[in-house]
Amino acid sequence: MLSLKYRIVLGLAAVVMLIDQGTKWLVEATIPFHGTVPVIHGVFDLVNIRNRGAAFGFLNRSDIEWQFWLFLVATVLAVWAILSLTRASKNEPVLYTAFGLIMGGALGNLVDRIRYRAVVDFLDFYWGEWHWPAFNVADIAICIGAFLAFVAMYRQPSPERGNKE
């Protein structure tokens, strides 16, 4: 049987991946490709777009074919690193939560990359002419996970700070 730390990481990753894929399925079933559904006029729309790049549109260019392989390898390495760090860590529930969120988000976006060679993005925030790049549930999970990992590592005692919290 898997230890509690692996159950936390893998269980949360599975939940994130299912929510991510479920929301993307709902968007694809209800919003035409490149369609827009206004939610809060002038602030927030639901959209159905594809992003071939990384988070927030980085490397989102159709003329770059190698980015699929880059993101595939990066996801495999991230999952391997998360499992290795989980094995090496001792009783760190915040860190396990962070790892589960990051892994679930990475795997959710990987499913899209395998299906479409792009990621389905649907949350679009803007103000006037300013637009934040569209994103999805997987991106949210990765960002929250990265923040929690930072918090967990910052809380670790260091030789310079001693064991004070």
UniProtKB/Swiss-Prot annotation:
InterPro entries: Peptidase_A8. It is a multi-pass membrane protein. Pathway: Protein modification; lipoprotein biosynthesis (signal peptide cleavage). Its EC number is 3.4.23.36. The keyword Hydrolase applies. Keywords: Aspartyl protease, Cell inner membrane, Cell membrane, Hydrolase, Membrane, Protease, Transmembrane, Transmembrane helix. PROSITE patterns: SPASE_II (PS00855). Pfam families: Peptidase_A8 (PF01252). This protein specifically catalyzes the removal of signal peptides from prolipoproteins. Belongs to the peptidase A8 family. HAMAP family: LspA (MF_00161). This is Lipoprotein signal peptidase. It comes from Nitratidesulfovibrio vulgaris (strain ATCC 29579 / DSM 644 / CCUG 34227 / NCIMB 8303 / VKM B-1760 / Hildenborough) (Desulfovibrio vulgaris). The lineage of its organism: Bacteria, Pseudomonadati, Thermodesulfobacteriota, Desulfovibrionia, Desulfovibrionales. The gene is lspA.
